[in-house]
């Protein structure tokens, strides 16, 4: 949607949240993240990176100001799927996170040339993933 467009990229929204230690994946409402707890977010948006495009992910400052720390990597050229993002409530207080809320910004980068092997050819462990995915899809 146009609401996700930013001056430098695109905001990605929360589809699911999995809180470490809780076997239930939350898909609606507001999720309370306990203090000092790791959690995982999957994105509503499905991305499809061309073989000459990668992207950086940046946690929205809204969450940083609430004490959330994000552990993100780059989205590799050739990756396709939803994203699973690791985060941590670093405060001594619970943090409330609504499903559907904007969580991070994706900033795309053009590579100087196409990759020799894109993500699907190199490992592809999470290629095509949907929802919170903690284990590789391929072995």
Describe each model-derived feature in a short phrase.
Residues 1-139:
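DUTPase catalytic domain/fold
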């Amino acid at each position: 949607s146009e609401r996700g467009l930013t001056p430098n990229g695109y905001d990605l929204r929360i589809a699911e949240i999995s809180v470490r230690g809780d076997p239930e994946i939350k898909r609606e409402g507001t999720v309370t993240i306990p203090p000092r707890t790791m959690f995982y977010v999957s994105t509503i948006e499905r991305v499809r990176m061309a073989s000459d495009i990668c992207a950086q992910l940046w946690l929205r400052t809204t969450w940083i100001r609430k004490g959330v720390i994000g552990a993100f990597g780059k989205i590799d050229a050739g990756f396709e799927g939803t994203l699973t993002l690791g985060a941590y409530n670093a405060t001594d207080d619970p943090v409330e996170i609504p499903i559907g809320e904007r969580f991070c910004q994706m900033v795309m980068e053009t590579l100087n040339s196409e990759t020799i092997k894109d993500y699907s050819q190199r490992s592809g462990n999470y290629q095509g993933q949907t929802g919170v995915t903690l284990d590789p899809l391929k072995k």
